[in-house]
């Protein structure tokens, strides 16, 4: 019996010793109370934060919203900040997005940086113009089988000062979404039923943040328009998780609330006189529409512009009336559609095939100087890769190839 008591006593003593060691180490490694984060050397911009918080979250808590399309997961590489002091060693998770030269200069991913001491960081001045809005859903309608147009109303008296090609981030609270509750019009339900998509559910326990490009242009004021493709699991494995954010967005109905922040962006048009060639597919339509409307309606440019859009079938086409109208109004604008899998009921007499092949065969191969054009593209990853490869073969330099990774 004495041996048992001694054993229990020794065990308790060891546990207490370990606890004391951990508490001592924590007291040395993590400061108590708040720490100060100096920003751009401006005392008025300095904030305080709790040790152990991530830098991205601490900035957001103080109303400074750094772009993070993945919501802080470390996968998008957008939440870059320059840390001049107090950031510690760069983590392996950051090195996929930050070069050795950039790391040496202090570049870090704010979602991966844990606050341990006072810090000194630098942020672009435009970040301080980023705000958050609680919007109301005006409509959420199918534009194609798997693409909805979400239209949000900005609060009265407010505006989102975005540029064409820009994007916002939208927040989704924890939720449980059942695909059977989605409002899918009869003309699109066939594929949904055939693939068993109405049986899918998406249950998310944490807040989610994702980025979406605007489909409207700056003069369409008071609203934000997004094209959102539902990220369903592949039909041959419906047990895989559905897209967290797209499932949430597809569940939104008129009158619902949605929180956005922004504006953000890098996918902006160059201020030159060069010919502009836009190439899109799928939900990559969004920034294409924003850019083209902005060029022709707001800027009233006389630059030569063409738009090449690829869809599977006629049922997957949208904004046709918009682009037909722009083409009629502007002699310097032409737009073209290619269907990769036209259906018998389409009675399609237009171009067929993948859009990069159609663009090459019907325009670029006979173009006197494709290398002098500016190419703006947004679509599915395979489309983007094929277009870039084709442009490289034509001698187009990187500086004339602009890619939006979010719209597809």
Curated annotation (Swiss-Prot):
Keyword check for Transmembrane helix: yes
Requisite cofactors: [2Fe-2S] cluster; FAD
Occurrences of domain FAD-binding FR-type (ranges): 130-270
GO biological process: sodium ion transport
TM helices/strands, residue ranges: 4-24
Protein topology in the membrane: Single-pass membrane protein
Cofactor: binding details: Binds 1 [2Fe-2S] cluster.
Residues annotated as binding [2Fe-2S] cluster: 70, 76, 79, 111
Reactions the enzyme catalyzes: a ubiquinone + n Na(+)(in) + NADH + H(+) = a ubiquinol + n Na(+)(out) + NAD(+)
Pfam families: FAD_binding_6, Fer2, NAD_binding_1
Domain of life from the UniProt record: Bacteria
EC number: 7.2.1.1
Places the protein is found: Cell inner membrane
The keyword Magnesium is annotated on this UniProt entry: no
Function: NQR complex catalyzes the reduction of ubiquinone-1 to ubiquinol by two successive reactions, coupled with the transport of Na(+) ions from the cytoplasm to the periplasm. The first step is catalyzed by NqrF, which accepts electrons from NADH and reduces ubiquinone-1 to ubisemiquinone by a one-electron transfer pathway.
Subunit details: Composed of six subunits; NqrA, NqrB, NqrC, NqrD, NqrE and NqrF.
Family of this protein: Belongs to the NqrF family.
Name this protein carries in UniProt: Na(+)-translocating NADH-quinone reductase subunit F
């Amino acid at each position: 019996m004495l041996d048992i008591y001694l054993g229990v006593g020794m065990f308790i003593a060891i546990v207490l010793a370990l606890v004391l060691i951990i508490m001592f180490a924590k007291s040395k490694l993590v400061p108590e109370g708040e720490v100060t984060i100096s920003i751009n050397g401006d005392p008025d911009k300095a904030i305080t934060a709790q040790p152990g918080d991530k830098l991205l979250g601490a900035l957001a808590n103080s109303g400074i919203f750094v772009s993070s399309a993945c919501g802080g997961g470390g996968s998008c590489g957008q939440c870059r900040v320059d840390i001049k002091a107090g950031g510690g060693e760069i983590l392996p998770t950051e090195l996929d997005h930050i070069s050795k030269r950039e790391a040496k200069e202090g570049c870090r991913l704010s979602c991966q940086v844990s606050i341990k001491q006072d810090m000194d960081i630098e942020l672009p001045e435009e970040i301080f113009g980023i705000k958050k809005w609680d919007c109301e859903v005006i409509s959420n309608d199918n534009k194609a089988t798997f693409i909805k147009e979400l239209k949000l109303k900005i609060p009265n008296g407010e505006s989102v000062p975005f540029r064409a090609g820009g994007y916002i981030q939208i927040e989704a609270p924890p939720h449980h979404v059942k695909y059977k509750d989605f409002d899918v019009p009869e003309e699109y339900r066939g594929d949904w039923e055939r693939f068993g998509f109405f049986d899918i559910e998406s249950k998310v326990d944490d807040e989610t943040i994702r980025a979406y490009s605007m489909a409207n242009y700056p003069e369409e004021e008071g609203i934000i328009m997004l094209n959102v493709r539902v990220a369903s699991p592949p039909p041959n494995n419906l047990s895989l998780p559905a897209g967290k954010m797209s499932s949430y967005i597809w569940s939104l109905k008129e009158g619902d609330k949605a929180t956005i922040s922004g504006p953000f962006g890098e996918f902006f048009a160059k201020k030159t006189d060069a010919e502009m060639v836009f190439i899109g597919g799928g939900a990559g339509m969004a920034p294409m529409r924003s850019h083209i409307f902005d060029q022709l309606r707001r800027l009233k440019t006389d630059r030569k512009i063409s738009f090449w859009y690829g869809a599977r079938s006629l049922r997957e086409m949208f904004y046709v009336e918009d682009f037909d109208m722009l083409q009629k109004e502007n002699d310097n604008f032409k737009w073209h559609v290619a269907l990769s899998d036209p259906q018998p009921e389409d009675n399609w007499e237009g171009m067929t095939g993948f859009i990069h092949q159609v663009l090459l065969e019907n325009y670029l191969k006979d173009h006197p100087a494709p290398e002098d054009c500016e190419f703006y593209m947004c679509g599915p990853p395979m489309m983007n890769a094929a277009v870039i490869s084709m442009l490289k073969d034509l001698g187009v330099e990187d500086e004339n190839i602009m890619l939006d990774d979010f719209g597809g």
